[in-house]
Amino acid sequence: MNSMIKDIALAPTGHQKIAWVKEHMPLLNILNERYAEKKIFDGLNMVVTIHLEAKTAYLAQTLKNCGANVVVTGSNPLSTQDDVAAALADSGITVFATHACSQEEYDLYLSKALDTKPSLIIDDGGDLVNMLHSTRRELIPNLIGGSEETTTGVHRLKALNEAGKLAFPMIAVNDAYCKYLFDNRYGTGQSSWDGIMRTTNLAVAGKTVVVAGYGWCGKGVAMRAKGLGANVIVTEIDPIKGIEAVFDGFRVMPMREAAKYGDFFVTVTGCKDVITKEHFPLMKDGAVLANAGHFDVEINVKDLEAMTVEPAYEVRKNITTYTMPNGKKINLLGEGRLVNLACGDGHPVEVMDLSFAMQFLAMKYLLEHKGELQNNLYVLPEELNTEIAALKLEAMCAGIDTLTPEQYAYLHAE
């Protein structure tokens, strides 16, 4: 099957990017060394729908090295890097992805990938799973199962599962300790500010940053904003998380009040309509809006477009400026899509090494338990988290103590 990419001539740059991340992903290298010769996925068709950049490309190559017939699609229209897609295609992996594709093209790419009749899938955000449950149900009998990378995707899976409609086993990799404690917090924290700062070239120190949502991703964004010298305000709907934010030293208030103070706004909720027409008129002139949630629904862009009294314009690459009726200008980054990928290179390599090692093990676990799992949402066994964490510590030249027999007996005494 022929790939659908921007331009195969872009491959050399993509190969360079993949070679760089390979040097900094020791866990995937270990898994590659351990299982490539055994071809543990031999002959299995696998669809990987994920933000298509160098780190994810190396995951796809590792799965291919271990015997899988891998097809890759992007999970967000603005996160695909065309040179990396070309490099993957050049290395023999079928790719259906282009940067800034239309919604129609995006859906076509997902459908083309599913035409390969996969046995295993890796999803990021839930679009692939949604298509399987809606327009491509004929493929479900062939599925062993799949895994989900993100909080947003897990929310969608939980809704399916609670309604009794989940049609095949899925593993919530996002809910693994080695994923959310590091990827969601440290990954999102660093990469979101990398995207914001490289796009705006503005100082963060001394500014007021409003972080919408105080889950693990929001904690990371707020932590890094504080470290950069910002005054941080958190908005929440959960009183427990609100208390957490206060105890972490942040002001907590409703978005309607916070809208008056923010210089930067970062949404990290996984929900829609977090910032809307109710809030835009209250904002400072020059306010910067960024979304770090999976879908472009957290900042209501349609409201912005309806309210602007002058045609919106790109004032700088990846910054669209809207003029409010009161004359104030509001700057939207990356069309309201994932700022760390639409405006940057995504999470740090070393962090994604943990997440993608978990994805690899999720595929292995599903295969090893073929026919044993119900149509349900699962988390990876704790021993796999522990194994990956131990390997990562070793790769980082760090070590921990072990319990003596006496200590073990003390802790496990009845």
Feature annotation, model-predicted:
Residues 2-41, 72-80, 85-207:
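Glycine/serine-rich phosphate-binding loop and adjoining beta1-alpha1 elements at the start
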Residues 114-115, 204, 256-262, 280-284:
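A short, aliphatic-rich alpha-helical micro-motif
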Residues 12-25, 41-45, 53, 168-206, ...:
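Adenosine-phosphate binding glycine-rich loop
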Residues 67-69, 93, 138-141, 229-230, ...:
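A short helix->loop->beta-strand "cap" motif at the edges of active sites that frequently abuts
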Residues 5-10, 16, 29, 35-36, ...:
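Ligand-binding pocket scaffold of soluble enzyme catalytic domains
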Residues 50-68, 183, 187-261, 267-272:
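Glycine-rich phosphate/diphosphate-binding loop of Rossmann-like nucleotide-binding domains
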Residues 74, 120-124, 137-152, 271, ...:
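ADP-ribose/adenylate-binding Rossmann-like module
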